[in-house]
Amino acid sequence: MIQMALATEKALKLIESYNTLTLIVDKSDTKDDIKKSVERLFNVKVVKVNVVITPQGYKKAYVKLAPEYKASDIAHKLGIF
C-alpha cells in the first residue's frame, strides 16, 4: 500500500498548483488499489491516479484529488507542508 509521501520541490509544487499528492507505493499496487486506499485513509475523493516506476526501482503515484478537497490539508496532516 502507501509507503510514504514525497516532500520534494516538485511534489510541493504539484500540491499547490494541481491539488495532487505524490506518494511512494508498493510495486504490486494497481491504480485502483491506490485510489481506494487514499480515499479510505484520508476520506477524500480521488479524480485520477498516474503511476511511474522510477529508475531507482520504486513506484511513485501522482494522486489528483477532487476540487472540493485540498491536497495541502492532507499534506499538512502528513507533516509535509
UniProtKB/Swiss-Prot annotation:
Please give one Pfam family short name: Ribosomal_L23
Arranged from A to Z, the UniProt key words for this protein are: Ribonucleoprotein, Ribosomal protein, RNA-binding, rRNA-binding
Q: Which InterPro entries match?
A: Nucleotide-bd_a/b_plait_sf, Ribosomal_uL23, Ribosomal_uL23-like, Ribosomal_uL23/eL15/eS24_sf, Ribosomal_uL23_CS
User: GO molecular function terms here?
Assistant: rRNA binding; structural constituent of ribosome
Q: Belongs to which family?
A: Belongs to the universal ribosomal protein uL23 family.
UniProt subunit comment:
Part of the 50S ribosomal subunit. Contacts protein L29.
Could you tell me what this protein is called? Large ribosomal subunit protein uL23
Organism of this sequence: Saccharolobus solfataricus (strain ATCC 35092 / DSM 1617 / JCM 11322 / P2)
